[in-house]
Amino acid sequence: MVREDRSTWKANYFTKLVELFEEYPKCLLVGVDNVGSKQMQEIRQAMRGHAEILMGKNTMIRKALRGHLGKNPSLEKLLPHIVENVGFVFTKEDLGEIRSKLLENRKGAPAKAGAIAPCDVKLPPQNTGMGPEKTSFFQALQIPTKIARGTIEILNDVHLIKEGDKVGASESALLNMLGVTPFSYGLVVRQVYDDGTLYTPEVLDMTTEELRKRFLSGVRNVASVSLAVNYPTLASVAHSLANGLQNMLGVAAVTDVSFKEAETIKAFIADPSKFAAAAPAAAAAPAAAAPAAKKEEPKEESDDDMGFGLFD
């Protein structure tokens, strides 16, 4: 098989990337740091039928995206995020499910000296099973220990490595001796591209109820601003109508203007005693029901006593 020259390969790559953006409405921009070729092959197999994965050099990705901005200007949002080792996962399925599949294919890895820790590494109190000759490793890391039954025992919780720190040779050696593989590597979602909109992966964690609360909060904010500047919007129109009705009722109360909603207020102003008499009558109705209930009690007692007298 004749291998295509570099210029042809680049042209084919540009074409493929553009076609994928046209075919798929959404994709995940993923980081691929510390992902080996074998693991990448396993990820591709797991995503087969669900998503299309495309990697490439950053310079080629940027060039391909810039060349397609005329047809799809929204791709410009991706350009600032094409840094370090990245790739694309194109899909037509639910983005949250695709991310879950990527997380399922993360692999555990040892802490190599010189690597940047992707997470905190802590050691709980434990018996290490190591002999006293290994005490120097713990002393170098200032880990409090004691010898119990001929083995080294860690006394307290130890925060061995902090996220973002470089792994030292002593930390790496100790974790290897303990058989601990604290890190895991895989495709990490950095940005989500969905029909021209770019957002962070945290949005995928939001539930329907959280979205509803945020939407209602936004509607309330829009209504408040609209009312403050006297600019009617769909969110504020109900409040504007209610405020307008209150103003009209206030005008009707002190003028001869009358309409159906104002009749009760006008009647109250004309003769408040009618409403004062109605209030005790309404309160008396529940009170009148109480004696009626009490009158029924003797009847119930007589029924219970029938046939069970003291002299039967």
Swiss-Prot record:
Phosphorylated. Keywords: Phosphoprotein, Ribonucleoprotein, Ribosomal protein. GO terms for molecular function: large ribosomal subunit rRNA binding; structural constituent of ribosome. Residues 287-312 are annotated as: Disordered. InterPro entries: Ribosomal_protein_uL10, Ribosomal_uL10, Ribosomal_uL10-like_insert, Ribosomal_uL10-like_insert_sf, Ribosomal_uL10-like_sf, uL10_eukaryotes. GO terms for biological process: cytoplasmic translation; ribosome biogenesis. GO terms for cellular component: cytosolic large ribosomal subunit. It holds the Pfam family Ribosomal_60s. Ribosomal protein P0 is the functional equivalent of E.coli protein L10. P0 forms a pentameric complex by interaction with dimers of P1 and P2. Belongs to the universal ribosomal protein uL10 family. PANTHER family: 60S ACIDIC RIBOSOMAL PROTEIN P0, LARGE RIBOSOMAL SUBUNIT PROTEIN UL10. This is Large ribosomal subunit protein uL10. The lineage of its organism: Eukaryota, Metazoa, Ecdysozoa, Nematoda, Chromadorea. The gene is rplp-0.
